[in-house]
Every structure is written in C-alpha cells, then in structure tokens.
UniProtKB/Swiss-Prot annotation:
NCBIfam families: reco. This is DNA repair protein RecO. The gene is recO. One of its GO terms (cellular component) is bacterial nucleoid. The keyword Transmembrane helix does not apply.
C-alpha cells in the first residue's frame, strides 16, 4: 500500500548502491515503508562504510520526491555475514525486492519476514525452504498469491491429479501429461510446508519460478546467473 511520505527515523537495509556524482552514492533501501531510493552524500566517510547489504540500519530520509536524501544513517545492530550459497541467496532476495517492489509501497510484514530471513541465512539453515517461504510471502504481499490446497474452480486439490499454474489465477487440473505440471500430493505438501514429502521442495522451486516469471519481464536475474556460473566453474 502506497503511503503519504513523512520524514522519520526508521529501520532499513541496503539492497543496492552505486556511485552517484562526486563523493555521493545512490542507494536502494528496504524499509517498512517499502523500497526507497536516496542519495547519500559524503558516501566515502564513516557513515558511507555502512552502505552495504545485510547490515541493520537506522535511517532518516528527507524529501518529497521519489529520490530522497539521507539525513542520518547509523548501525542498528550487527551485520549478517553471509558467505557461499547463503550470500548468493541474500543477493537473490535483494534483487527480487528491487525488481518487483514498487517504490514507496509499504509492506511492513514483508520487511519483518526479510529481517527474520537474514539471520537464518547467516546461520546456514537449509536454503531452499527459506527462499521458497520468502518468494511466497513476496507474491502474496504484491497481490499475486494463490491457494495451494484449492484449484481455480474452488475445488480441493486432489493428491492423485495433475495441475498446471495459471499465473496470477491459481492451479488448474489437467488431463494428460504436459511439461511443467505439478502433482496434487506435492501441492498439498507445499501448503503445509512439509518438505519431507519426496519431490515437494523441487516442485516448490519450479512453482515459484513459474509464478515469478511474468513479473520479471523476461529479464534474467543477475544473482541467479552468478550463482549458476559459480557452480559451473572448474575447481582445482
């Protein structure tokens, strides 16, 4: 929900930053008020060292246009040190937020989910359930969510049937095999987040890719490509 802007102190995380004019930086922030873009002046100073992802910040922004000015920025807690696959997973979440969240569209519940996900990544908990939960929450917050236990006709999902995803509508039963289908047992497992069911986690990854694809505009995710390149690179 887009909310009227008022200058205030609020928690924030840096999603992305880049140099902007002389010694300034252009920063994309994620806050309870949504994704905000701001100019950080004197970005090479002490405060500028905080302009990096996964650091819990307290920020004061000023300005009425979509491009704000950082009036104050300080650490609000320890940084979440992500490495390896957890680092690429964090980059993936940040890229999803940049690509999909409209500017200044408040999603406080999504922000809290992000806050809870970062330490879980830093603790090297299983990545796939964390990523699927965040993707699902993001889709739901943006109004693109759909039921996993009921099809688009309002009928309960049948564990013995096959279904296809109709983007932004829901799951539709199909007769006969075709690429990209999901079996009902997998869908019911997803609805309960029961990842012990064989194939459920892999099916959830396919489902989220299909659900997100129409909203990414056909452009590949850089974080996903970097991760795939890392996996494919030869090792000594």
């Amino acid at each position: 929900m887009r909310t009227p802007w008022a200058a205030m102190h609020q928690p924030a995380f840096v999603l992305h930053s880049r140099p902007y004019k002389e010694s300034s930086a252009l920063v994309d922030l994620f806050t309870p008020q949504g994704r905000l873009r701001a100019v950080m002046r004197a970005a090479r100073g002490k405060a500028g060292s905080l302009i990096r992802p996964f650091v819990s910040l307290e920020v004061e922004l000023r300005g009425k246009s979509e491009l704000k000015t950082v009036a104050r920025l300080e650490s609000a807690g320890p940084a979440h040190w992500l490495d390896g696959q957890a680092l690429f997973s964090g980059m993936y979440l940040n890229e999803l937020l940049i690509r999909l969240l409209p500017a200044e569209d408040a999603h406080p519940a999504l922000f809290e989910h992000y806050v809870a996900t970062l330490p879980a990544l830093a603790e090297h908990r299983p990545l796939e359930p964390l990523l699927r939960a965040f993707e699902w929450r993001l889709l739901d917050e943006l109004g693109y969510g759909f039921a996993l236990d009921i099809d688009i006709a309002g009928q309960p999902i049948d564990a013995q049937r096959l279904y296809r995803l109709v983007p932004d509508a829901g799951l539709e039963p199909v007769v006969g095999f075709q690429p990209g289908l999901f079996n009902g047992a997998e869908l019911l497992a997803m609805a309960e987040a029961d990842w012990q069911v064989p194939g459920a986690l892999a099916a959830a990854k396919r489902l989220m890719r299909q659900a997100l694809a129409p909203h990414l505009g056909g452009r590949p995710l850089v974080s996903r490509e970097l991760f795939m390149n890392l996996k494919e690179s030869p090792r000594d």
